[in-house]
């Protein structure tokens, strides 16, 4: 009798655990939307849009352009920071290459 109760209890716990697991991950993976306003709230971005029932968050896309390795000895050997992202500048690091770093 005790083994039957233990078996039923274990099956019940496994069922509840699996149900909770599925519900948690379904909510996190759900990117569906009906209005753009839902996406603005979900993405925390005014430029977010609901396109074909899915949220598109533009700030999550990052465009990184490859740069050529520029050899240097000091920061003065590096080019102007216009090739770096906004508020970054070139610095000569220990490996002797110019690298964009944030201020």
Curated annotation (Swiss-Prot):
Signal peptide positions on this chain: 1-29
GO terms (BP aspect): defense response to fungus; killing of cells of another organism
Record flagged with keyword Iron: no
Annotated disulfide bonds: 33-50, 39-55, 43-57, 72-92, 78-98, 84-100
Gene Ontology CC entries for this record: extracellular region
Lineage: superkingdom: Eukaryota
UniProt keyword annotations, A-Z: Antimicrobial, Disulfide bond, Fungicide, Plant defense, Secreted, Signal
This protein's record includes keyword Signal: yes
Subcellular locations according to the entry: Secreted
Location, primary (coarse class): secreted
Family statement drawn from the similarity comment of this UniProt entry: Belongs to the DEFL family.
Protein name: Defensin-like protein 289
Species for this entry: Arabidopsis thaliana
């Amino acid at each position: 009798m005790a083994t039957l109760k233990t078996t039923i209890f274990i099956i019940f716990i496994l069922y509840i655990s699996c149900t909770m697991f599925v519900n948690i991950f379904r909510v996190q993976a759900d990117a569906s939307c009906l209005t753009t306003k839902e996406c603005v709230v979900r993405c925390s971005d005014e430029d977010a849009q609901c396109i074909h029932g899915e949220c598109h968050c533009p700030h999550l896309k990052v465009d990184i352009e490859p740069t050529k390795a520029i050899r240097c000895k000091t920061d003065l050997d590096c080019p102007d920071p216009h090739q770096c992202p906004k508020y970054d500048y070139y610095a000569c690091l220990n490996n002797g290459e110019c690298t964009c770093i944030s201020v």
